[in-house]
Amino acid sequence: QGGVSVNCGGTYYSSTQVNRAINNAKSGQYSSTGYPHTYNNYEGFDFSDYCDGPYKEYPLKTSSSGYTGGSPGADRVVYDSNDGTFCGAITHTGASGNNFVQCSY
């Protein structure tokens, strides 16, 4: 998965936290939360530096356990649904309505 840290609208996530989110998503143990789910990339972000998709998204959290339910917050990791490769990170912070903007990484 590599070590990619991201900054989503001023919230910093270490590569460990990013990888934890992907691992939680792949485990399926929190699927009752509705995540992970397909990310269709309606915004047209370019994730090709990291992967080609198809994409899934999962909430990013700073807590040691990562997202395990409840409010998903504004930030998401996007990963390749075939192999779990990190693709990118997106956030509702700074976007209009329910849209996303890309995080920096």
From Swiss-Prot:
Please list the reactions this protein catalyses: [RNA] containing guanosine + H2O = an [RNA fragment]-3'-guanosine-3'-phosphate + a 5'-hydroxy-ribonucleotide-3'-[RNA fragment]
List the catalytic residues.
37, 57, 92
So where does this one cross the membrane? none
Q: What class of enzyme is it?
A: lyase
Cystines in this chain: 8-103, 51-87
Going by the UniProt record, its keywords in alphabetical order are: Disulfide bond, Endonuclease, Hydrolase, Lyase, Nuclease, Pyrrolidone carboxylic acid
Q: Which residues carry this modification: Pyrrolidone carboxylic acid?
A: 1
Q: EC number(s) per UniProt? A: 4.6.1.24
Pfam families xrefs: Ribonuclease (PF00545)
One MF annotation (Gene Ontology) recorded for this entry? ribonuclease T1 activity
CDD domains, per database record = fungal_RNase (cd00606)
- Keyword Cytoplasm (UniProt): no
The reply on keyword Lyase is yes
Give the family this protein belongs to, as stated in its UniProt record: Belongs to the ribonuclease N1/T1 family.
| Name recorded for this polypeptide | Guanyl-specific ribonuclease U1
Which species?
Answer: Ustilago sphaerogena (Smut fungus)
